[in-house]
Amino acid sequence: MTDLSQQFDRLIAQTDLNVSELQKEQLLGYVALLHKWNKAYNLTSVRNPSEMVIKHILDSIVVSPKLSGERFIDVGTGPGLPGIPLAIMNPEKSFTLLDSLGKRIRFIKQVIHELKITNVTPIQSRVEEFQPEEKFDAVLSRAFASMTDMVNWCHHLPKEEDGVFLALKGIYSEEEANDLPEWCSVKNVATLIVPELEGERHLVTLAGKK
């Protein structure tokens, strides 16, 4: 068993997540591809594969139990975060991964081809120009500097009835929540426990006021 495989098992044992052998293989395969492509494409500032396991894989998949619905979009996905790890963990759900940079979308296409991931649709577009045929149960992102930016840029993406925004944040700020536009409010703040990751992590659920 490789060091990364042992590290992964140790980290997962500290969570309530159930990960199959295939999912583990795909998640670690994604780390290997990210590490390989990163040298030429500069996809992430995290250079070390063992750090990627914590900061990219675990940090993404701890969100998995919080997902409800079938259709998700990851806006500003970068190299596929958190979308690829979440798609691996939820093969029955569909994930659209949106980014404006071609090199990132090319990388994601390579990942889904090599790892045989069938529930991801990569799209190169600016968020404000992307008009989906069908809206989403949830809009995910860890890319936006503020929740206000996220809901303003992505307001046209969630389902009107019950669609939500899921913002992956470090420290949760009441001040930032108070700055949200009038039509939107915080529905829930969940503390995420990421084994061996320093600093706070939160998942903030936002929705339009009914």
UniProtKB/Swiss-Prot annotation:
<dbReference type="InterPro" id="IPR003682">
    <property type="entry name" value="rRNA_ssu_MeTfrase_G"/>
</dbReference>
<dbReference type="InterPro" id="IPR029063">
    <property type="entry name" value="SAM-dependent_MTases_sf"/>
</dbReference>
<keyword id="KW-0808">Transferase</keyword>
<feature type="binding site">
    <location>
        <position position="76"/>
    </location>
    <ligand>
        <name>S-adenosyl-L-methionine</name>
    </ligand>
</feature>
<keyword id="KW-0949">S-adenosyl-L-methionine</keyword>
<feature type="binding site">
    <location>
        <position position="142"/>
    </location>
    <ligand>
        <name>S-adenosyl-L-methionine</name>
    </ligand>
</feature>
<protein>
    <recommendedName>
        <fullName>Ribosomal RNA small subunit methyltransferase G</fullName>
        <ecNumber>2.1.1.170</ecNumber>
    </recommendedName>
</protein>
<dbReference type="Pfam" id="PF02527">
    <property type="entry name" value="GidB"/>
</dbReference>
<feature type="binding site">
    <location>
        <position position="81"/>
    </location>
    <ligand>
        <name>S-adenosyl-L-methionine</name>
    </ligand>
</feature>
<feature type="binding site">
    <location>
        <begin position="127"/>
        <end position="128"/>
    </location>
    <ligand>
        <name>S-adenosyl-L-methionine</name>
    </ligand>
</feature>
<dbReference type="GO" id="GO:0070043">
    <property type="term" value="F:rRNA (guanine-N7-)-methyltransferase activity"/>
</dbReference>
<dbReference type="GO" id="GO:0005829">
    <property type="term" value="C:cytosol"/>
</dbReference>
<keyword id="KW-0698">rRNA processing</keyword>
<keyword id="KW-0963">Cytoplasm</keyword>
<comment type="function">
    <text>Specifically methylates the N7 position of guanine in position 527 of 16S rRNA.</text>
</comment>
<comment type="similarity">
    <text>Belongs to the methyltransferase superfamily. RNA methyltransferase RsmG family.</text>
</comment>
<keyword id="KW-0489">Methyltransferase</keyword>
